[in-house]
Amino acid sequence: MSYKQQYAQVLHDVIGDALSQEEIEQLIEQPKHEDHGDLAFPCFQLAKAFRKAPMMIATELAEKIDNPLFSNVQAAGPYVNVFLNREVVSREIIKRVLEEQQAYGSSELNGKTIVTDFSSPNIAKPFSMGHLRSTVIGNALNQISRKKGYEVVGINHLGDWGTQFGKLMVAYNMWGKEEDVRSEPIKELLKLYVRFHEEAEENPGLEDEGRAWFKKLEQGDEQATALWTWFREVSLVEFSRVYEMLGVSFDSLNGEAFYNDKMQHVIDLLEEKDLLVESEGAMVVDLEAEGMPPALIKKKDGATLYATRDLAAAVYRLETYGFEQAFYVVGGEQALHFKQLFAVLKKLGFENVDGMHHVPFGLIMKDGKKMSTRKGRIVLLEEVLQDAINVAKQNIAEKNPNLANAEQTAREVGVGAVIFHDLKNERMNNIEFDLEQMLKFEGETGPYVQYTNARANSLLRKGAYDGSAFNGSADDYSWGVVSMLNQFSAVIDRAFTRREPSIISRYVLDLAQSFNKYYGQVRVLEDDAEKQSRLALVKSVTIVLTEGLRLLGVGAPEEM
């Protein structure tokens, strides 16, 4: 039970039935200033029931509260502020962190599932910087959801279908070489795709050939299917290299093609409920009552659309996973598409639709412009990550030339810096990409948090930390750190509820700053009776910093 819950229980015992314990808990605040206590209860909602002014109620309640958990209880205007007993609370929190280790802050749920649709690059196209945000936000949400006790199904809804494959087949048959594609798949396939469009300007008949090849693919033609399968496989090999660098994995790679034979099922469901209406020759679902334009399901020529495929995917996932929630980590420009998707699913009578969420995000900017191309070419994510690793290598060589595991540490610091920089910003904000800035060891960066954690681990080694010697006491300077450790579980809850990984990023930055302040005030390694207790606090910080970074998908090297 959290201290907030315990305070709510104490208040409920005094107040009686005017408010439930849950209502009291929701009203309790955390004061912004330390001299206002650790928890504050506003009395406004009791005024009617007690027929008294909130200030008078606060004074009376403060006089009645007597509990060893609180060292001081004060009425401050209409608030009842309590100060936690620092010795008792410090002992409890540090003991809990040391006992629970990585499980500290976790929740337990029985078999509830969350499905996350994230990353979703297009096959045979470069894995550009444009895919970074969906990939790292989705991965962080998965880690946070697992921490909350959910079973998570991470889906990479690959863009592996469409007329572009017909064009690619024409281009490959005309100009491609197998050995070139095998050696540099994405580069060669992109080159062929670009050449197709250049040649098609002179020879428009190529477009018809492209359509014809895609039709062959749709009809299951052996040669077309073999080429499509190969393009998909070589692309995935290249993508998997980037995912490995980022430490991201998926439970399903079912992309657009997987739903080819599942769209009719959705169309049948829509017809059964009389939801399909004709509009200018096309088949649509009318969403006028929902204040939206109609959802286009079938074009005039009978061809299905992106929306039909997404409906088929949603229905398949609802029927297969029976999820409680689903997150679609996709850019904000798709907002209407998802509103329509959820509205159609509601009309079909699916119960879990309220748990389906579009999780949009802002753009990556470079010098105030959208970072999609560099000197007219696509900025490849793998190149950016490699650049970051190289800069991290240089920084480590300057700071610690004899570091034993320098290569692995540079990967964790370099890649971690890119991920952390993305996730320290609220996801709806555009982010400015500045490699030099994000790799600094000071300021609001991933390396700053990692370096703080490495420094804490160094103290444990130098001080010969012995976990069994913790006697539970904590000094006056440690309270800022202890109260930060206490917030970890609530921070995870907030990040999950808002689908906002930046809440975790801000927290690990604040915890790192709080620890560095403590380190500057206290001689941690002084050989006295309290040394092991101080080191127990340091150990608790390393556990929570490491776990907080893990939730973001960032490594925590023990030495830097």
From Swiss-Prot:
Family per record: Belongs to the class-I aminoacyl-tRNA synthetase family.
Enzyme Commission code(s) on record: 6.1.1.19
Gene: argS
Assembly behavior: Monomer.
Tagged with keyword Aminoacyl-tRNA synthetase: yes
Entry keyword Aminoacyl-tRNA synthetase: yes
EC class: ligase
HAMAP family xref list: Arg_tRNA_synth
Protein name from the UniProt record: Arginine--tRNA ligase
Pfam families listed in its UniProt record: Arg_tRNA_synt_N, DALR_1, tRNA-synt_1d
NCBIfam families: argS
GO cellular component, one term: cytoplasm
Annotated InterPro entries: Arg-tRNA-ligase, Arg-tRNA-synth_N, Arg-tRNA-synth_N_sf, ArgRS_core, DALR_anticod-bd, Rossmann-like_a/b/a_fold, tRNAsynth_Ia_anticodon-bd
Motif ('HIGH' region): 121-131
Catalyzed chemical reaction(s): tRNA(Arg) + L-arginine + ATP = L-arginyl-tRNA(Arg) + AMP + diphosphate
GO biological process: arginyl-tRNA aminoacylation
